[in-house]
Amino acid sequence: MFVTVHSPPATSHQPSATNHQSPATNRYHQPPTAPAIASVSLPTFLSTDPLAAEASLTLGEDAAHHMRVLRLEAGARVQLADGQGSRGVGTVVRVAKRNATVQVDSCEYVDPLPPVHLVVPIADRERMLWLGEKATELGASSWRPVMFKRSRSVSPRGEGPTFQQRLRLRMASALEQSGGAWLPMPFPDSTVETSIAAAPPGIRVVLEKGGAPIAALLAGDSSAPVTIVLGPEGGLDPSELELLAAAGFLPASLGSTLLRFETAGVAALAVARAVRG
């Protein structure tokens, strides 16, 4: 899958100035005259295939279409990312009707941010898509949707394979716009029990009015993974709160006002990144 950011055309032949285990060193070899990260003015193409210096990539029909819209021709410089820690710079070799070829000039591996995992309620589709976009910009490590007991019945709702595909596309676009290197790992719809079992050992919080300030709870070991649970707008059922408490989830507060789940998610992630990096 390839997605582009709609930036001004870049046809110059001159290079622009400028988380997971690191792959082998030779994969990220960079020629001294070609910096891996180009100017943000260059259009970006996200690949699900890993990047490798000097490799030739064949981009699909969507990417070729966007290249034609941007009037990119052979010799144009583009940015590349794979969503798994690699970013780089490439040169367009050919733009055809159904595909395009790009030569990877250089790439580099970007270490992942300290892990912050997000458990979200299944809710209104557009609001979930918006949160997925912002979660990507803020560097969420994973995204796990849960059907809580008090989740409201809305239509259309953000669930199922079709929604998950739309979410991945939205996240891909957000990654390109933000200049990030890692896409959140999207998990399928699950239950409270499944999300608890999947949470890694570390700092666990559930957003709940009356809890301790979230910044204080997240100020512990900076290397420990963080899992943040967002409840539905109807609130968490007492039985769900009991399950979370038994699994070590501490109630955390974002202040005295009542926030929508997507606002709370953005605020919690922003605090986590400010406190933990």
Per-region residue spans from a language model:
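N-terminal positively charged helical leader segments and presequences
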Residues: M1-S7, T11-H13, H20, R27-E108
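Glycine/charged-rich beta-loop-alpha catalytic/anionic-binding loops adjacent to active sites
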Residues: L57-L59, L113-H117, A224-T227, A246-L254
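Non-catalytic positions within long, well-ordered alpha-helices that form the structural scaffold/packing
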Residues: R68, T136-G139, A245
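Active-site/ligand-binding-proximal alpha/beta "capping" segment
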Residues: G202-L241, F249-L254
